[in-house]
């Protein structure tokens, strides 16, 4: 680290003729002229370093092979037990699209005290496209039964000692608890099956010490495949059987993790009553990085018995699963917050990140060279890799890379005899230094070794912003900005001078031919006739649906997904049902024009909260870039410069515009219902609405708290609601709107009462709607029935029906999905129209 933190030095920096700024790692900034420079140094850079999110590799949980079938591929081998037996099972099954497997281990305490929230959590997972496989425990219940029978409850290293008398009681208790979960799921409308035996094959672990406790040697997945085929949630008890048919007890944590090794689920969730894993002070640990913390944790005096067993099994499991796999420990009522909120309240256990230098025994030269090609765009052996290999062996240059080979660097001595190294080049898997936090782990590795310095063109705003976050000091100038780490203050002056004198990169000296095209030009050339779009505010429920629809679009490519909360993380951490290597960027108002240019963006989806998007739009208005903008907030629904994005009634105007104000969710239903009768109203119509709690967003609040909403609805903002003002403005006629939140997850129902100028019959009303929305595939007119929320949930359509007429009094019931036609579907319709594409591309396949 920098020493002499209170000492100031002055230096003359040549070739920089304008006012410069210097920043130290205590965040103080000193202005200085080109002839006199004051550089302050100190400590604190490590407080800026965030934990790295691992690169997500493709997970083989469900692979679609046709519209009506899929293949579930389980791992071909497992490890972690002494007697390892090959496990191989593959079966083609009929399965719904978007289904991804999540392994859920449920503690016995949850079954006993919080089964209602538990069932809500499992149903929530299914709602967002994740299919749970449940493994349950029953420790508290078994202990109670043993006490009643006069049997002692004994444990050795966290494992229950199981003599024949205990095993007999355990089988009865586990069956009872299994059926509790199954029956509760069935009562909630979710199909479930008990799987009490037949999944685990085992041998006795140590009969003299543990009795009838098993060591899992094989996983049988026939029962699981059968359940998934028929859309049943399998509920598995932690009992195994020997090849000869002897029943053995398996610790539920061990059972769940052994199953995870074999099926490689998209996510692993441990649901317990403590909402996480607690440390010695009784506080929940938010993150555990096993590669970094395991050895120290196992030495802690509070790590014993069950906790010690958990950590041991967590490591055994994560060591054999893809590096991106994590285990989330939370409670039923906090599951949604843990999955979606910025500050989850449970514990996330990850394998962590290991860094390699080119001198490390595990350094993979081939993978590192592939990373260079991926990052620099070199093809056909233009870089002389044999020369690079030789120079690495001689120490002419040094290489550092993360264990997933998604981020790396080349460094070389700043000058002969210098203790400071010059960072010659950065390499990133997806060609964007700003779109990954892997670079932070690379720098952490650098900090452990020596002092480093590098420079960047002052014009490269995106890179400079990133480097400022990870450097202990920097100076900015008209031509170049200089960044450094861990340089003593008495060496900074000379180091800066020597850094400025570096004229070319190492790779440029061993490259046979270089492309003259810029990165953005090459990107535009390689677009393959797909329009490139970006999504700002890419998190939560609406963002997930937009990402999914874009992912399945034949003519669109999601080039950027921006989220300040998730910056650098794989997009699958927010939307686990997707299969994508994309990582979150952090697009800001001051750099959206640069992102637009450098990434060849044809259109932006702005999924930001109200009153946030304007600075982004102002930057684009002041630049030469003119992408299509579809804003899902309410910011521009009252702005005449923007086009109201209601395709069924405003298609021609949308086609000629690049600024689209996407209608609100409730507003879509009210507008479409009232539009055919807007000229026939005597008084303002009254609109009573109930929305699912997903409409309150993924940030926890009373309006999306399932406990508060249980057997309840919550009215809110009953006058002057934004959607009331929006629809009144767009119709040119006032309305009244009374919104409520219900206990269901997604969907909207509206009951709208209108007083007309003249009497009408039901037949006349139905005919009016049918003519008005003829040839509109997303508008359904139900002339005889009453639309229900559950019938329209998960669909792209609006259903108008429930017609009740009494003279000139008309009541209409309308339903729609607030996340789809009320948000993502309509936004995609608008983007398709603006780009000249099929309006229903990526939508019609799901109708």
From Swiss-Prot:
Family: In the N-terminal section; belongs to the acetylglutamate kinase family.
Keywords per UniProt: Amino-acid biosynthesis, Arginine biosynthesis, ATP-binding, Kinase, Mitochondrion, Multifunctional enzyme, NADP, Nucleotide-binding, Oxidoreductase, Transferase, Transit peptide
Pfam hit, one: AA_kinase
Entry-linked CDD domains: AAK_NAGK-fArgBP (cd04252), AGPR_C_ARG5_6_like (cd23936), AGPR_N_ARG5_6_like (cd24149)
One Gene Ontology term, aspect cellular component: mitochondrial matrix
UniProt keyword annotation of Hydrolase present: no
Location in the cell: Mitochondrion
The organism's taxonomic lineage, starting at the top: Eukaryota, Amoebozoa, Evosea, Eumycetozoa, Dictyostelia
Protein's UniProt name: Bifunctional protein argC, mitochondrial
Signal peptide from the UniProt entry: none
Ranges of residues in domain N-acetyltransferase: 352-508
């Amino acid at each position: 680290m920098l020493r002499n933190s209170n000492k100031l030095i002055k230096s003359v920096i040549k070739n920089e003729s304008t006012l410069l700024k210097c920043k130290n790692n205590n965040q103080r900034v000193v202005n200085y002229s080109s002839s006199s420079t004051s550089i302050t140094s100190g400590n604190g850079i490590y407080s800026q370093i965030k934990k790295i999110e691992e690169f997500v590799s493709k997970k083989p949980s469900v692979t679609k092979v046709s519209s009506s079938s899929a293949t579930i591929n389980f791992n071909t081998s497992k490890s972690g037990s002494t007697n390892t037996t090959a496990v191989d099972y593959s079966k083609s099954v009929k399965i719904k699209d978007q289904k991804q497997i999540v392994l859920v281990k449920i503690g016995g305490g949850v079954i006993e005290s919080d089964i209602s929230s538990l069932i809500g959590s499992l149903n929530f997972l299914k709602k967002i496209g994740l299919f749970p496989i449940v493994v349950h425990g029953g420790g508290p219940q078994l202990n109670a039964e043993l006490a009643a029978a006069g049997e002692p409850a004994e444990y050795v290293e966290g494992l229950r000692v199981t003599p024949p008398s205990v095993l007999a009681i355990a089988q009865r208790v586990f069956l009872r608890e299994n059926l509790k979960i199954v029956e509760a799921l069935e009562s909630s409308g979710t199909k479930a099956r008990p799987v009490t035996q037949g999944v685990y094959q085992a041998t006795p672990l140590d009969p003299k010490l543990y009795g009838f406790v098993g060591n899992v040697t094989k996983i049988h997945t026939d029962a699981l495949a059968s359940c998934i085929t028929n859309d049943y949630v399998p509920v598995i008890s932690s009992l195994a059987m020997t090849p000869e048919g002897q029943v053995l007890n398996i610790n539920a944590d061990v059972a769940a993790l052994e199953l995870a090794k074999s099926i490689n689920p998209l996510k692993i969730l441990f649901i317990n009553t403590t909402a996480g894993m607690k440390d010695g002070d009784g506080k929940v640990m938010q993150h555990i990085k096993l590669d970094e913390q395991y050895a120290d944790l196992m030495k802690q005096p509070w790590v014993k018995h069950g906790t010690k067993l958990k950590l041991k099994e967590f490591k055994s499991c994560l060591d054999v699963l893809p590096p991106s796999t994590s285990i989330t420990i939370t409670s039923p009522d906090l599951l949604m917050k843990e999955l979606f909120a910025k500050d989850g309240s449970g514990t996330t256990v990850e394998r962590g990140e290991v860094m390699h230098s080119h001198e490390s025994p595990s350094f993979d030269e081939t993978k590192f060279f592939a990373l260079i090609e991926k990052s620099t765009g070199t093809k056909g052996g233009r870089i002389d890799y044999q020369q690079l290999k030789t120079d690495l062996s001689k120490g002419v240059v040094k290489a550092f890379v993360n264990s997933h080979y998604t981020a790396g660097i080349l460094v070389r001595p700043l000058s002969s005899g210098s203790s400071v190294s010059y960072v010659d080049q950065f390499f990133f898997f997806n060609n964007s230094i700003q779109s990954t936090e892997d670079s932070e782990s690379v720098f952490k590795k650098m900090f452990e070794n020596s002092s480093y310095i590098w420079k960047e063109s002052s014009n490269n705003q995106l890179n400079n912003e990133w480097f400022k976050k990870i450097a202990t000091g920097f100076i900015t100038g008209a031509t170049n900005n200089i960044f450094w780490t861990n340089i003593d203050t008495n060496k900074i002056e000379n180091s800066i001078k020597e850094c400025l004198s570096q004229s070319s990169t190492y790779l440029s000296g061993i490259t046979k031919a270089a492309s003259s095209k810029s990165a953005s030009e090459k990107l535009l050339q390689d677009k393959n006739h797909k329009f490139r779009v970006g999504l700002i505010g890419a998190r939560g429920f609406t963002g997930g649906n937009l990402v999914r629809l874009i992912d399945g679009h034949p003519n669109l490519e999601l080039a950027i997904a921006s989220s300040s909360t998730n910056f650098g993380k794989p997009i699958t951490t927010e939307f686990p049902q997707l299969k994508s290597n994309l990582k979150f960027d952090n697009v800001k108002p001051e750099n959206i024009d640069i992102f637009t240019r450098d990434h060849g963006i044809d259109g932006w989806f702005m999924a930001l909260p109200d009153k946030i998007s304007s600075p982004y739009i102002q930057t684009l208005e002041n630049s030469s870039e003119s992408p299509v903008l579809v804003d899902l907030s309410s910011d521009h629904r009252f702005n005449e410069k923007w086009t109201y994005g209601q395709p069924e009634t405003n298609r021609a105007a949308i086609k000629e515009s690049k600024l689209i104000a996407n209608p609100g969710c409730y507003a879509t239903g009210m507008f479409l219902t009232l539009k055919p009768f807007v000229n026939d109203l005597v008084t303002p119509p009254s609109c009573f609405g109930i929305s699912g709690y997903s409409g309150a967003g993924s940030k926890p609040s009373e309006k999306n708290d399932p406990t508060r909403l249980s057997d309840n609805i919550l009215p809110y903002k009953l006058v002057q609601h934004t959607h009331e003002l929006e629809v009144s403005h767009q119709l040119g006629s006032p309305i009244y709107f009374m919104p409520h939140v219900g206990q269901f997850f997604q969907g909207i129902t509206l009951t709208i009462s209108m007083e007309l100028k003249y009497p009408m019959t039901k037949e006349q009303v139905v005919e009016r709607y049918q003519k008005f929305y003829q040839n509109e595939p997303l508008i359904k007119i139900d002339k005889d029935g009453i639309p229900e929320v559950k019938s329209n949930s998960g669909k792209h359509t609006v259903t108008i029906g429930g017609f009740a007429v009494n003279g000139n009094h008309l009541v209409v019931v309308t339903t729609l999905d607030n996340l789809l036609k009320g948000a993502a579907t309509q936004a995609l319709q608008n983007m398709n129209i603006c780009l000249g594409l099929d309006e229903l591309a990526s939508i019609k396949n799901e109708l």
